[in-house]
């Protein structure tokens, strides 16, 4: 696919060639097989990353699911989200991660899942998963009773 005459974020007007899901080239007078779209100098931006979302599934799908949250993200130009761990159950064990990942299969965008730390977290099983980060470590209470004390915080930092 080729997008001609697109205004980039820095104000330059260029052609953008896309191969599959990746930008292949940015320049002038590019050629490509397949669809050609004239952007007519409209702004063309890459997909955004929202590294801090709170999809409430599992535990509270009446508030938001991976499907509804990711649909909203995609509508706003977000192509990757990272969900925070304070759900019910909190994402503090490998089993809880697996449960959340099953829900995330309904996502319409790429995603990452943050792990969390609680007094009963299981770092061995949690950190064996593709956890994006240990996100939102709470020194006060939050959804999922995720508040921890300073000693556990220090231990979590060393394990991560």
Please place each PLM-identified region on the residue numbering.
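Receiver (REC) domain switch-region micro-motif
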Residues: 36, 49, 134
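Histidine-rich, glycine-flanked metal-binding segment
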Residues: 1-46
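Structural signal for conserved beta-strand scaffold positions within catalytic alpha/beta enzyme cores
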Residues: 37-38, 83, 113
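Divalent metal-coordination and catalytic microenvironments
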Residues: 6, 21, 41, 52, ...
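A generic structural signal for alpha->beta connector loops
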Residues: 33, 78, 108-110
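Metal-associated gating/positioning segment near the N- to mid-region
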Residues: 42-106
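Histidine/acidic-residue-rich, glycine-tolerant segments that coordinate divalent metal ions
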Residues: 87-96, 102-160
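Short strand->helix junction
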Residues: 9, 55-56, 141
